[in-house]
Amino acid sequence: MSPVFLPSGETYDQEHLDDNRVLGYNPLVPAALVQQEIPVSETSRKVITDSRKEIQAILNKQDDRIIVVVGPCSIHDPKLAMDYAKLLKPKADELQDALCVVMRCYLEKPRTTIGWKGLVNDPNLDGSFAINKGIRMARQMYCDVTNFGIPLASEMLDNISPQFFADLLSFGAIGARTTESQLHRELASALSFPVGFKNGTDGTVGVAIDAIGATAHPHTMLGVTKQGLAAITMTRGNKDTFIILRGGKKGPNYDAEHVAAVRKDLEKANLPPRIMIDCSHGNSSKNHLNQPKVSKSIAEQIRNGDSSIVGVMIESHINEGRQDAPIRPGVKDTLKYGVSITDACVSWEQTAPMLDDLAEAVRARRQNQKSN
């Protein structure tokens, strides 16, 4: 769809006081319409409500399992998402006594500079930015995966897209670049599911701890209704929140020493000691082959009785590594099957033993607690 150009056209004209750097606006399909076109099935509804309750129970120490958010760094093809879900489902069922498995299914990607921003923003991978198409593709994918029996996790990047997808999510994350943002803290206070805040890109945890405290309170903010109208939104606050350790510029922060320090920081702020650890990003030193090492360390801490670790994140795809995806027409046809086009991921073959080890660690912790 071509942009609807403003009177100022494609030139910068200081005589115009507003929208000088905006080329134009295209209509956005209302969330209410998309939800009606692509509704939630009864099977999906049960998967979503049950998994939300399970995650809440784990956070509140009413369930001694851990949450495992595992899946591709980003989704560029809905078919690959379903193919991955078909690998994940049997393993999730097998380990459900120890792990609450949620599939990572990220639709939008924050970029350090520029680059492909995700399935919603550019579903064709050609710079056409067919956002209305991307919204429908993404919602159908979410419906398909949840109907298959897999709960979903995604990152919250703006306060409009959740109106299209939040009813299908069981878990949300606020990324390292946006944890300090007031807008994202307000958004998290409105979401109907648990939300984790990552530590800052510099590795410090203070911004995430502040975010958890702020999100627990009600907020009044600018928002958009499902009909697409600008609105003043009032939130209840969200106490189902926790910190996600992802490492940073100063190095990894997944080891027992860092976890103990963060636990003390949370307690000092009068917050529950709930810690999820990301095996990727700064904790893997941006090398996907380090993720199993990180996971092994986390499992060992759990075996040793650490109850503050409530979850783990793993960037995993069907096949390992990553590939470049130049944004141009026809690029989709040239991509390798099941390989990430954003961050490098471990393969499914590498992922399955990581899940087994984490499950065994939870069972060992459970047995030790019973013995004591």
Swiss-Prot record:
Lineage, top-rank taxon, reads Eukaryota
Which molecular function terms from Gene Ontology are attached?
3-deoxy-7-phosphoheptulonate synthase activity
What keywords are assigned to this protein? Amino-acid biosynthesis, Aromatic amino acid biosynthesis, Cytoplasm, Nucleus, Stress response, Transferase
Q: Name one GO biological process term.
A: chorismate biosynthetic process
Pathway-wise, it operates in:
Metabolic intermediate biosynthesis; chorismate biosynthesis; chorismate from D-erythrose 4-phosphate and phosphoenolpyruvate: step 1/7
Does the entry feature the keyword Transmembrane, yes or no?
Answer: no
Protease in keyword set: no
- Extract the Gene3D superfamilies matched here: Aldolase class I (3.20.20.70)
Instruction: State the family it belongs to.
Output: Belongs to the class-I DAHP synthase family.
Would you tell me the protein name for this molecule?
A: Phospho-2-dehydro-3-deoxyheptonate aldolase, tyrosine-inhibited
Species of the source: Schizosaccharomyces pombe (strain 972 / ATCC 24843) (Fission yeast)
What would be the name of the gene that encodes this protein?
aro4
